[in-house]
Amino acid sequence: MKQILFMDTTLRDGEQSPGVNLNEQEKLQIARQLERLGIHVMEAGFAAASEGDFQSVKRIANTIQNATVMSLARAKESDIRRAYEAVKGAVSPRLHVFLATSDIHMKYKLCMSKEDVLDSIYRSVTLGKSLFPTVQFSAEDATRTARDFLAEAVEVAIRAGANVINIPDTVGYTNPEEYYALFKYLQESVPSYEKAIFSCHCHDDLGMAVANSLAAVEGGALQVEGTINGIGERAGNAALEEVAVALHIRKDFYKAEPSMTLKEIKATSTLVSRLTGMVVSKNKAIVGANAFAHESGIHQDGVLKEVTTYEIIEPALVGESQNLFVLGKHSGRHAFTEKMKELGYEFTNDERDAVFEAFKKLADRKKEITEEDLRALMLGEAAFAAQQYNITQLQVHFVSNSTQCATVVLKDEEGNVFEDAATGSGSIEAIYNAIQRILGLECELADYRIQSITQGQDALAHVHVELKEGAHQVSGFGVAQDVLEASARAYVHAAGKLKSFIQLVK
């Protein structure tokens, strides 16, 4: 049975989702979790896009040990060399070079002839192969490219040294029958077909990204590209967790097994959702809150008698387990550290001390600490530690009518303390006005969302905010048992990003 490899582009294509703005530390958190998920290749970013992207790609490349780290590049020498500088320190570096092959792209975007495109493919892949052990070539907008020319372009790329050929459905235009037929056509029409691994990359504009990816596997694709939770620009990408579980459950049909640690799916989905601020729909397949819920009396009766009557996926398969008690206020530092290691977290002594202190504070207020609490705690403390400013004091009191007054004290990375107070129509507005006064910002609150991320009256709150000033928009999040504290943390997280970005642009 063939093994299907997965190329995750959450950190590149996924980050292009409107409103998503991950910092370097957040990208590294996701990369480490993708490594635990067993992702074969992770596209860490587009190194030539900016200095920030370059540094993020480089740090991920120098950190990840058990996956190939890849950078995107246009078919330009400067892009390719920049990508090499970013990922050369990786255990397994790869170049992903792309060039459009459809008539509409060649005419209106590239202003290049077919001959020019073929020449550019050959030169860019040849250069890439002289620097990288493996090169992936993507024929952008392949599904709207004339088949004979696509086959010619693919052959040129393979002869130039490409190890992986990606056939992307860039605008989500195709359907499963057409996509399957396209892979079969290339299998028959490309003389050097057997010398490369063929890959699929599907967008969800018509709601068929997962179905198209599975059709590509039927047609001979050995690598599937996509993102966690299906995030991405426009309608998003193929959700890798859905493709992987579909292959596993229906291996009788696809004759293929996913090369992925399925039990890490839920944890990965949750991390990506919270860091990006993109909430997973409750009825989403595999990872939605209702994915394993049964409300119908007939269904409940059937499941109680025999679970397979209405459940084709065991929740434990994807790491969806009961919210079991694991630690309490009497748990010591050693037990805490061992449990965090079991969950896949590693940190320095200073990081451990900070998270353990936060754990003890939570344990004093919450009788039972679950794995979900620990994951949320780690997520919140990691974001808190990476901020330019941290909240050291927060006070809110009633003034008159609906007016509230908030006093906020912040400390920066150098230990400088800043304090200010402001009023507002409610506690949240007062807190945010005070933070704006301290940081000297005049930004608009574009989005504010709050959700409970653990169960019970003593649940942890996760607050996501988006701030906008002019053309600049950033997001931030905060985790705490107290809603006001979580809200303040989220605002400081986003405001610090916004201030840094504005200073960088200036």
UniProtKB/Swiss-Prot annotation:
Protein EC: 2.3.3.13
Main location: cytoplasm
Superkingdom, natural source: Bacteria
Record region (Regulatory domain): 390-506
Major enzyme class: transferase
Record bears the keyword Amino-acid biosynthesis: yes
TM stretches of this protein: none
Span of domain Pyruvate carboxyltransferase: 4-266
A Pfam family annotated for this UniProt entry: HMGL-like
Cellular localisation: Cytoplasm
Pathway: Amino-acid biosynthesis; L-leucine biosynthesis; L-leucine from 3-methyl-2-oxobutanoate: step 1/4
Coiled coil segments of this chain: none
Function description: Catalyzes the condensation of the acetyl group of acetyl-CoA with 3-methyl-2-oxobutanoate (2-ketoisovalerate) to form 3-carboxy-3-hydroxy-4-methylpentanoate (2-isopropylmalate).
HAMAP family: LeuA_type1
Record protein name field: 2-isopropylmalate synthase
Source organism (scientific name): Bacillus anthracis
Gene (UniProt): leuA
